[in-house]
């Protein structure tokens, strides 16, 4: 039986911090798998585990075709062969197929071999179609890949990759992704993209990734095959990539190449190391240049691994802080082709908006003209226009232009920084209710202002800002200090439930979860049976049963589509239940 779980813990842009568990072993994503060549170990798997790499990838085809490795792997298993107790993923020989045109093994043979040697995550023998291949070849390769996927699905007894192919034809990528999503696989790599990255065709890479993501199930992690340079991590994660692999740490080291988050330097160019990893803290560039080749290669490989790990941590911290777009913007300026890819990504507004959180831990900073195209800005402008029809009194915002006056206390309008300051005016007692009604219309959708038309709004004695919202002695909502949006009380939730037709704002849970939700307990993904597809990450939602009876209110971590798909992890952090 396959033991595999994936859940989302935090998110920003289309990126996410997740927890992946396979066979009782856990890693946090985004994660990178250092590539291990069992014939040539620059850094041992055991050392990689000590450095914090909880997952590695090696090539099952090389092991299969090397008699001594094959015999030992069959005898003791791949974990003992490599002396590594973390998660081991394997490729199938597809890379050799793309590079050299052929492999001497069948799909069934390699899948069965992977299971026999005890890998954690296997890969069937897909056909990687290189970029710009003739359409007919891409279609035929994909037909064979999907046939092999079906065969692998029928015989597999381990967690398995199902790679999305289709060359540089977006429609084929989306088609492949949809077909594979219908099958029983655990992870979806996006394959045959190394040639795009090697030739700096990052703009085309964006098209391939987004086309694939649009067809894939959102509850499965996505692996960008062959992507291991830190300069691309922020952009790739913002697109929705969860897993990477890198042979570059060792291959570059052999050529005296030194990785940085902004690009690659040759050791001969460096007088100073711009890094404080254990290698760069101990040696100077000159000292490394004077070392024997083998020792120098090993130390450069270690540095490259440290900088890869550091950049992934930087990306994860940016997600936690709601700053991933700022990091993407910064990294994109390290190369013109990466900058072009960043601009291309911002053209996919529909895809990005569905994954963009409704609120963030950090203020919006206008750091570039491109930042005005971030989905949080585009959404805010669109919603403000809708609110303006009901609350026509406007003020001029230096970043967002003309906005309804009564949204001026709320995210992202109040929590933003540009070249010019935006002065926030404290609301007067006579108009403070309008602020609440306008924010409801902005946050919950058209018509929801009616739920607060008789509200009494308490102002903070300290700041003069709206805080508690009540009506007829009952608590409706809280006007949050951190972002000027509303957290619903159960009475406010009841009013919205009466106003809004099903399924708006709803998360429907099954009978098992119902008594817990009523008592204010969190809702987990496996108990969700339906949801409003317009729900966005960190939205306030109404939790109901199959009969649309209100059970609770809370904040969701997932968007509407994800709520219906995920089977692991937290779905809604419940704030109030009808019985508590």
From Swiss-Prot:
Alphabetically list the UniProt keywords: Glycosyltransferase, Metal-binding, Transferase, tRNA processing, Zinc
Q: What Gene Ontology molecular function terms does this protein carry?
A: pentosyltransferase activity; RNA binding; zinc ion binding
A Pfam cross-reference name: TGT
Q: Which domain of life is it from?
A: Archaea
Task: Give the GO terms filed under biological process for this record.
Answer: tRNA wobble guanine modification
Provide the PUA domain boundaries: 504-579
List the CDD domains: PUA_archaeosine_TGT
The answer to keyword Transferase applying to this record is yes
Q: Which HAMAP family is this protein grouped with?
A: TgtA_arch
- List, alphabetically, the NCBIfam families matched: arcsn_tRNA_tgt, tgt_general, unchar_dom_2
> Would you tell me the protein name for this molecule?
tRNA-guanine(15) transglycosylase
Native source species: Thermococcus onnurineus (strain NA1)
* Encoding gene (name): tgtA
């Amino acid at each position: 039986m396959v033991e595999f779980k994936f859940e989302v813990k935090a998110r920003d842009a289309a990126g996410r911090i997740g927890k992946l568990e396979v066979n009782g072993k856990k890693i946090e994503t985004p994660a990178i798998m250092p590539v291990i060549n069992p014939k040539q170990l620059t850094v041992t798997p055991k050392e990689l585990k000590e450095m914090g790499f909880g997952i590695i990838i090696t090539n099952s085809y090389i092991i299969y075709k090397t008699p001594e490795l094959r015999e030992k792997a069959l005898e003791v298993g791949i974990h003992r062969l490599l002396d590594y107790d973390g998660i081991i993923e394997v490729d199938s020989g597809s890379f050799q197929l793309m590079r050299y045109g052929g492999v001497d093994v069948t799909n069934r043979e390699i899948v069965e071999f992977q299971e026999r040697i005890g890998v954690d995550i296997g890969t069937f023998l897909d056909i990687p179609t290189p970029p710009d291949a003739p359409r007919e070849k891409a279609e035929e390769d994909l037909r064979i890949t999907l046939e092999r996927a079906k065969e692998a699905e029928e015989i597999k007894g381990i967690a398995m990759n199902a790679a999305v192919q289709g060359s540089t034809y977006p429609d084929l990528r989306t088609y492949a992704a949809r077909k594979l999503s219908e099958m029983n696989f655990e992870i979806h790599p996006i394959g045959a993209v190394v040639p795009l990255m090697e030739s700096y065709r990052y703009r085309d890479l964006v098209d391939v990734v987004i086309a694939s993501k649009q067809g894939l199930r959102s509850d499965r992690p996505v692996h960008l095959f062959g992507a291991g340079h830190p300069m691309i991590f922020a952009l790739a994660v913002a697109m929705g990539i969860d897993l990477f692999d890198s042979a570059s740490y060792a291959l570059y080291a052999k050529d005296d190449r030194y990785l940085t988050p902004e690009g690659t330097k040759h050791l001969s160019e460096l007088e100073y190391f711009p890094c404080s990893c254990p290698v760069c803290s101990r040696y100077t560039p000159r000292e490394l240049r004077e070392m024997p080749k083998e020792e120098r290669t090993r130390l450069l490989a270690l540095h490259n691994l440290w900088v890869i790990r550091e950049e992934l941590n930087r990306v994860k911290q940016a997600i936690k802080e709601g700053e991933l777009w700022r990091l993407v913007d910064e990294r994109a300026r390290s190369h013109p082709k990466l900058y072009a890819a960043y601009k291309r990504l911002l053209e996919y507004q529909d895809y990005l908006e569905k994954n963009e959180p409704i609120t963030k831990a950090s203020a919006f900073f206008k750091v570039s003209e491109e930042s005005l195209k971030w989905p949080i800005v585009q959404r805010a402008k669109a919603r403000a226009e809708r609110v303006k029809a009901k609350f026509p009194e406007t003020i001029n915002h230096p970043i967002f232009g003309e906005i309804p006056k009564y949204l001026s206390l709320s995210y992202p309008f109040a929590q933003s920084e540009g070249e010019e300051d935006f002065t926030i005016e404290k609301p007067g007692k006579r108009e403070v209710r309008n602020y609440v009604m306008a924010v409801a219309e902005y946050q919950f959708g058209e018509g929801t202002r009616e739920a607060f038309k008789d509200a009494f709004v308490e102002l903070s004695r300290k700041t003069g800002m709206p805080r508690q919202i009540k009506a007829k002695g009952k608590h409706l909502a809280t006007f949050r200090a951190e972002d000027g949006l509303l957290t619903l009380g159960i009475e406010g939730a009841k009013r919205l439930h009466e106003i809004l037709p099903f399924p708006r704002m709803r998360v429907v849970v099954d009978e098992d979860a119902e008594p817990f939700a009523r008592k204010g307990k969190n809702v987990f993904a496996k108990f969700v049976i339906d949801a409003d597809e317009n729900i966005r990450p960190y939205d306030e939602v109404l939790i109901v049963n199959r009969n649309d009876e209100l059970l609770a209110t809370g904040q969701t971590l997932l968007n509407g589509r994800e709520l219906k798909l995920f089977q692991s992890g937290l779905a809604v952090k419940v704030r109030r239940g009808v019985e508590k």
